[in-house]
Curated annotation (Swiss-Prot):
It comes from the Viruses. GO terms for molecular function: metal ion binding. Belongs to the Cu-Zn superoxide dismutase family. Disulfide bonds join C52-C102. This is Cu-Zn superoxide dismutase-like protein. SUPFAM superfamilies: Cu,Zn superoxide dismutase-like. It comes from Ectromelia virus (strain Moscow) (ECTV). Signal peptide: none annotated.
Length: 125
């Protein structure tokens, strides 16, 4: 299993790449985007030293995600990507060829942990 943590400005999410019933799936959620359609794209290298500006050209289009009016996208996509070949590569969330958020895909162990998103308002609460 592989995982990518997205944390860029107000955009946050967790994207998992995992086998489910013999097929590879892309699962997760993202918050903080405006409603609409966005693309999930894997890039050849995982250099995010200058944020999303430092990742190279797109390599693999994973699919589109749909953000609801509350700014939440629930991700459940089929993929033909071999999970072992994407470790260390960058994943971006893009719209109209603009990279809005990104992260590096890493190895994840299967466990029973649940990740909760915490949003903080302008008062720090």
């Amino acid at each position: 299993m592989a995982v990518c943590i997205i944390d860029h400005d107000n955009i946050r999410g967790v994207i998992y790449f995992e086998p489910v019933h013999g097929k590879d799936k892309v699962l997760g959620s993202v918050i903080g985007l405006k409603s609409g359609t966005y693309s999930l794209i894997i890039h050849r290298y995982g250099d995010i030293s200058r944020g999303c500006d430092s990742i190279d050209s797109p390599e693999i289009f994973i699919g589109n995600i749909f953000v609801n009016r509350y700014g939440v996208a629930y991700v459940y996509l089929d993929t033909d990507v071999n999970i072992s070949t994407i470790i260390g590569k960058a994943l971006s969330i893009s719209k109209n060829d603009q990279r809005l958020a990104c992260g590096v895909i890493g190895i994840s162990f299967i466990n029973e942990k649940i990740i909760h998103f915490l949003t903080i308002n302008e008062n720090g609460v």
